[in-house]
């Protein structure tokens, strides 16, 4: 059993907690504490009721200092400075850093100084962390001495396994990506000020282009893909689930059947449980609460001139990513204890 704490109890922090209690990993991961500046009553309410993922399946209540889930008492903390958190006395193995604002080594080291053994960041980080992991692709890079690790992004976790499969079978020469991402809480409900002028506009009324560093994220996981990809991203008026339009030029000549067969075989083999495949006529809401990183929509695969391949990938950008946080944390512990 590993002892973990969640720092930042927003969309990803709450999804991590739910994922622990809804998965078979509950017997291996114990959530000991949550650090969040919000009031306990609000934390309780948003744990019990979730617009996207529904009601929590187990009774949740508060006492003076804890959130009680079944027989578990999770300590609630409200400390703005991570260096002051009681990780040492709580014997914390891993902190899930889910605030969205702590994303470099120096900031994360405050958790280590407070007594945590390791930190797993729930978003892309600066290059000075020990490793950036996309579970299923490069978790073997983890070493015992790694203390600060990034779990990359939901979109990187969605696309990199698929690129990896295509490259190993057909050799990827280049690619272009459009991420069609659900609205996020850095957007406005109605028009309001924001440093990004496009994000001053109402999230529910427009398709909104935003900056993305997805192409650079691919390079970090697959260094031989440096300068081979470019990406753009648009936010759309849905609250969850992301689609990725992936176009790649392959060295080998292929047809639709070959591409789909190779991808489907990967989902039944080394990427089982991480990447999925479907030929059903599904829409975005059908992938809500799907724990996989990526689902290939075989009905949308297209091939032009034998070398240009277009794919449509789906992912639950909250739930799939939260489940990968759990997988990566277990791999970190495995490497540390090896």
Curated annotation (Swiss-Prot):
This protein's UniProt keywords: Cytoplasm, NAD, Oxidoreductase, Pyridoxine biosynthesis
One protein family per Pfam: Gp_dh_N
Gene Ontology biological process: glucose metabolic process; pyridoxal phosphate biosynthetic process; pyridoxine biosynthetic process
Entry-linked SMART domains: Gp_dh_N (SM00846)
Pathway the protein takes part in: Cofactor biosynthesis; pyridoxine 5'-phosphate biosynthesis; pyridoxine 5'-phosphate from D-erythrose 4-phosphate: step 1/5
Transmembrane segments: none
An annotated Gene Ontology molecular function: NAD binding
Subcellular location: Cytoplasm
PANTHER family: GLYCERALDEHYDE-3-PHOSPHATE DEHYDROGENASE 2
Family according to the record: Belongs to the glyceraldehyde-3-phosphate dehydrogenase family. Epd subfamily.
NCBIfam families: E4PD_g-proteo, GAPDH-I, PRK13535.1
Function, as annotated: Catalyzes the NAD-dependent conversion of D-erythrose 4-phosphate to 4-phosphoerythronate.
Protein name: D-erythrose-4-phosphate dehydrogenase
């Amino acid at each position: 059993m590993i002892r973990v704490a969640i720092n930042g109890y927003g969309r990803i922090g709450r999804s991590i907690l739910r994922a622990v209690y809804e998965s078979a990993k509950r017997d291996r991961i114990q959530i000991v504490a949550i650090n969040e500046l919000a009031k306990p009553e609000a934390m309780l309410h948003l744990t019990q009721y979730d617009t996207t993922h529904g009601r929590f399946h187990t009774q949740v209540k508060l006492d003076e200092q804890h959130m009680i889930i079944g027989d578990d008492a999770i300590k609630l903390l409200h400390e703005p400075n991570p260096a002051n958190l009681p990780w040492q006395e709580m014997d914390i193995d891993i902190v899930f850093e889910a605030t969205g604002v702590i994303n470099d080594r120096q900031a994360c080291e405050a958790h280590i100084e407070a007594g945590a053994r390791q930190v797993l960041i729930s978003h892309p980080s600066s290059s000075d962390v020990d490793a950036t992991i996309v579970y299923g692709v490069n978790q073997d890079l983890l070493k015992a001495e790694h203390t600060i690790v990034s779990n990359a992004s939901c979109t990187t976790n969605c696309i990199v396994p698929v690129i990896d499969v295509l490259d190993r079978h057909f050799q990827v020469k280049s690619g272009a990506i459009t991420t069609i991402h659900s609205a996020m809480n850095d957007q406005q409900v109605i028009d309001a000020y924001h440093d990004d002028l496009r994000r001053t506009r109402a999230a529910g009324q427009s398709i909104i282009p935003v900056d993305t560093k997805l192409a650079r994220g691919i390079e970090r996981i697959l260094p031989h893909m440096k300068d081979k990809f470019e990406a753009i991203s648009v936010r759309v008026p849905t609250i969850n689930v992301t689609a990725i339009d992936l176009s790649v030029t392959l060295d080998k000549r292929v047809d639709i059947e070959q591409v789909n067969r190779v991808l489907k075989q990967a989902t039944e083999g080394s990427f089982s449980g991480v990447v999925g495949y479907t030929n059903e006529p599904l829409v975005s809401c059908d992938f809500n609460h799907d724990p996989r990183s990526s689902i290939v929509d075989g009905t949308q695969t297209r091939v032009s001139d034998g070398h240009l391949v277009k794919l449509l990938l789906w992912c639950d950008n909250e739930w799939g990513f939260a489940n990968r946080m759990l997988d990566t944390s277990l791999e970190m512990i495995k490497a540390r204890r090896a």
